[in-house]
């Protein structure tokens, strides 16, 4: 469950390390984002010479959450951190690599490029 003011790790190689959620882009009045939801975020920590700088406002898709995700078969999955991948306006990843596992729910939401770049899909 990601809400405004939540800090997330960045799971790609765009140069950002931490982002802070500003807005959840899901419906008109959504309070929380979960895996596969798009958020608007501000870059709070970045490495020098990266594709994004501190203070940039970016769109990102949530790929891991500490709050468990319940699946239709009754199982649940949760991760050790909250993480996102920075995307462009066409919902394609801006980076060329994705670090760490991502949830299977991304495939159902149409983020196939992120799923194919990820080393592991859980």
From Swiss-Prot:
Pfam families attached to this UniProt entry: Ribosomal_L14
CDD domains: Ribosomal_uL14
GO cellular component assignments: cytosolic large ribosomal subunit
PROSITE patterns listed in its UniProt record: RIBOSOMAL_L14
Subunit structure of this chain's protein: Part of the 50S ribosomal subunit. Contacts protein L19. Forms a bridge to the 30S subunit in the 70S ribosome, contacting the 16S rRNA.
The organism of origin for this protein: Thermus thermophilus (strain ATCC 27634 / DSM 579 / HB8)
Biological function: This protein binds directly to 23S ribosomal RNA. Contacts the 16S rRNA of the 30S subunit in two different positions helping to form bridges B5 and B8.
The entry's keywords: Ribonucleoprotein, Ribosomal protein, RNA-binding, rRNA-binding
UniProt record, GO biological process: translation
Family: Belongs to the universal ribosomal protein uL14 family.
Protein name as catalogued: Large ribosomal subunit protein uL14
Gene Ontology MF terms: large ribosomal subunit rRNA binding; structural constituent of ribosome
């Amino acid at each position: 469950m990601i809400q405004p003011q939540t800090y997330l790790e960045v799971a790609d190689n765009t140069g950002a390390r931490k982002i802070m959620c500003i807005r959840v882009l899901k419906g008109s009045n959504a309070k929380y984002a979960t895996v596969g939801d798009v958020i608007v975020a501000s870059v709070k920590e970045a490495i020098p010479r990266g594709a994004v700088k501190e203070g940039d406002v970016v769109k990102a898709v949530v790929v891991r959450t500490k709050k468990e995700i319940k699946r239709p078969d009754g199982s649940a999955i949760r991760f050790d951190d909250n993480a996102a991948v920075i995307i462009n306006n066409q919902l394609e990843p801006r980076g060329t690599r994705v670090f760490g596992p991502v949830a299977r729910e991304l495939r159902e939401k149409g983020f196939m490029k992120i799923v194919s770049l990820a080393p592991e899909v859980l």
